[in-house]
């Protein structure tokens, strides 16, 4: 997806000056941007919202969803599975190395009462390699209190190397 000449609206930050690295941006439960280098897409790398992943690679999602964080583990995990309203799936096929960071930006709108319940599923195929950076941030001037329940599953198959970093800057009302 490419950015056009449209202006950002409301609390959505501008993304027109972004480098060409794999990137997914969500505000609330909506995708506002997906960016994938053509060479990585040709190798089968997928980075998209959960609903789209269920359409594109349902067998992969079904095989690994809940394997690292089972809903049977505790009430918080069960609540996440029952109530997540958005999220993402990153799939890297076997033997694919990504030489630039993969980045996810998840924005919680502080003026919205939509719960911030996300499920992130990262599947790194055999002998794949990637660096993943996740940013969670509240935006806006509101002070609406909402719940937040995030579950992040990283499935690293044999020989896979995954470096994971997260920066959380959620507001005090989440």
What is each model feature region?
Residues 1-174:
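Glycine-rich and polybasic anion-binding loops at the starts of cofactor/ligand-binding domains
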